[in-house]
């Protein structure tokens, strides 16, 4: 299965689907072919990765945040 993640980057940060995929691949080492269901909004985006990659992605962004709120978190379930 896949995990849906939220990232606090969007169009105002000059991101589109292509740039977000490149950024995620470069930052996490996750092959962009494994990143799916990308939705880029104005100030945030969503993407899906396989469960086993999700923990790695969350951990990497948690470490990069230096104790501040991480750029990436689990997306809240759709109501």
Which role does the model predict for each range below?
Residues 1-79:
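Terminal-proximal interaction/regulatory segments of ATP-powered molecular machines
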